[in-house]
Amino acid sequence: MTYDTPIMQGSILIYSASKAGLEPIVKSIQFKDQSITPGKIVCIGKNYKAHIEEMLSAVPEEMVVFMKPNSAIGTTLRAFSDEPLHYECEICLLVFEGAIAGVGVGLDLTKRSLQGRLKQAGLPWERSKSFDGSALFSRFVAASVNLTELSLELWVDGLLRQRGEATSMLYSPAEIQRELQKFLTLNDFDVIMTGTPAGVGPVSVGACFEARLIHDQIKLSSAHWTAV
């Protein structure tokens, strides 16, 4: 397979295939000063008790896992995709050589109404979670800090809408990695989204979002989007 010249869109590098319409577009994210291509995004659901409570759900007996494909990576924050979308801000981990090499922050966009219907029917969530453009990321930085000391903030139009600490997770980053590796191969540059704290809500057209990854009151990485 051959690719044309890579095109930068925000923090995402997109390779367009040489045969338009016949080959897929492979999407990449930024890790330090490199562009890397995740093969998959592994997502953890129901990992903060406060979020479970706001969704009127029950604490699961086992870790909840679902997937997003590479095609879910996007740069544009959309308010609508067949139905209104909801934001969920998450601490994100980047895998390399079997270890957590990078950390960032991201948005897991969700078709909440569809997700509710799928849950009620006992069906998988992917149709409401894994659509194109449903995963937005900041630049990833080296994981040189204690992962349990990470926190996130999501600001919308200057108001703090979400805040969460890794210490409040039901499954810590290390526990997530160990549990996943019991049944799943984590390849180089795969991304793990570790779940969202309370405060999720609908995306409004024109709203300005800033997601921050924080350690010891220092901002490690951030990303800005204006919803369309």
Predicted regions and their residues:
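Catalytic-core "active-site belt" of small-molecule-metabolizing enzymes
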Residues: 4-191, 199-228
